[in-house]
């Protein structure tokens, strides 16, 4: 059955700290074109590879990968909130198949997803519930993290299952590329911050303060008065070109230290793109198109969108 891929950056800062209106308009135009592609494809299932930002996953149990058999979007920043229409039996079968492929993946019957998942669904489908969706969490901010090779193999295992599922499937990678927003770290954290990173579920009294800190960090970043890692368009474009080339195993040589050095601490979200392309590659050779790339300091992100499909289509 057919498969289609859409990968895109996300930002919680849209509407809080925005670039020039023409840049926002260009991003919205590109996302509207992606929605048109999705609408024309009319998927019977959406699989979203997405990170989390200490909103749903914490250090009390931090899996490298997790498949959601039931999930709710928490609505952080201005993202959509509500229950996702997860086909539980299919998600369970997916988890069993991935485990049988020797990829150790966790399973959640009460997954919480944040803007990293919800914004992608909103951009591509206009809602959280237009299509059945299975969220696949990939840890991208909380060391230690799985390698890019493991993310690729996760995607391959997911893709092999989907190729036998008899459905039109949209696979989505949400995250990246180079960026380093002010995400807290456990190493060196105060006792209060460490406790939130370990067991900080449902921290509604703190959410407004966290959002304010992120907005303030974006304003400082734009003003050039920031310690955050600079955006790296050259590195971004090299990574995007690698995905487009079809030589996906080349990501296996990218180490976690090198990703942090070149792209910033949150550039590890490229794992979601790698997994999505891994799922597509399980169907065979593919052709990919880079629809948009721009370094957007206001959003603290190298911002990109790509789409791809099997070469035989």
UniProtKB/Swiss-Prot annotation:
Molecular function per GO: 3-carboxyethylcatechol 2,3-dioxygenase activity; ferrous iron binding
Assembly and oligomerization: Homotetramer.
Enzyme class, first EC level, given as a word: oxidoreductase
Keywords, alphabetical: Aromatic hydrocarbons catabolism, Dioxygenase, Iron, Oxidoreductase
Pathway listed: Aromatic compound metabolism; 3-phenylpropanoate degradation
GO biological processes: 3-phenylpropionate catabolic process
Known EC number: 1.13.11.16
Recorded name of the encoding gene: mhpB
This protein's name: 2,3-dihydroxyphenylpropionate/2,3-dihydroxicinnamic acid 1,2-dioxygenase
NCBIfam families: PRK13370.1-2, PRK13370.1-4
InterPro entries attached to this UniProt entry: DHPP/DHXA_dioxygenase, Xdiol_dOase_suB
Annotated organism of origin: Cupriavidus necator
Entry superkingdom: Bacteria
Function in brief: Catalyzes the non-heme iron(II)-dependent oxidative cleavage of 2,3-dihydroxyphenylpropionic acid and 2,3-dihydroxicinnamic acid into 2-hydroxy-6-ketononadienedioate and 2-hydroxy-6-ketononatrienedioate, respectively. Also catalyzes the cleavage of catechol.
One Pfam family this sequence matches: LigB
